[in-house]
Design a protein with these regions (language model features):
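Hydrophobic/aromatic beta-strand patches that form the interior of the parallel beta-sheet core
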Residues: 2, 91-93, 117
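Catalytic active-site module of serine/aspartate enzymes centered on a nucleophile-bearing elbow/loop
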Residues: 114-149
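Active-site nucleophile elbow and catalytic-triad environment of alpha/beta-hydrolase enzymes
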Residues: 64-83
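Alpha/beta-hydrolase-fold enzymes
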Residues: 1-65
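Conserved alpha/beta-hydrolase "acid-adjacent" motif
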Residues: 99-105
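Short strand->helix junction
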Residues: 61, 99, 124-126
């Protein structure tokens, strides 16, 4: 299993807290209610053009529905609770300045036999950073070693 910046935790602040409490009621009557966020291209990588290219993608949707938001939170809680039972060899990469998924969110994987690498100065899109190919090489080497190739 190879993971990059896995969202295994979250911090709800301000309106996010309200959505977690009021969200189920909103979803009951308006399941397609749009939850919008102030997206910032600088949140994706140390190279701002990575975020800019993401925002220029014509297939990108700039919101999620209340249903998707609540299901995501529920799955994060479920998966985080199941980490102790993870029996797959696991490699985790995380940028230490990830603004989308805080670096502490991947710490629970250290409790299992996971290899967790935290990269200094990198954001969420570690494979799209200038050193992304080096990280991909590290991942490939780990896969080859783990599978005995």
């Amino acid at each position: 299993l190879v993971l990059s910046g896995p969202p295994l935790g979250y911090e709800l602040e301000g309106s996010d807290k309200v959505l977690k409490v009021a969200g189920p009621l909103i979803r009951r009557f308006r399941p397609g209610f749009e939850v919008r966020d102030e997206f910032d291209p600088a949140n994706y990588a140390s190279d701002i053009t990575v975020g800019e290219r993401f925002f220029e993608d014509p297939l990108r949707v700039d919101f999620m529905t209340i249903s998707l938001a609540l299901e995501t939170i529920g799955e994060i809680d479920r998966v985080t609770g199941a980490i102790a039972g993870l029996a797959l060899p696991t490699w985790v990469g995380h940028g230490d300045v990830d603004r989308l998924v805080p670096v502490w969110a991947s710490e629970p994987l250290e409790s299992v036999a996971a290899v967790r690498k935290v990269y200094d100065g990198l954001g969420h899109e570690i494979l799209n950073e200038p050193v992304g190919l080096d990280i991909a090489d590290e991942m490939a080497a780990w896969i080859e070693q783990t599978l005995g190739l």
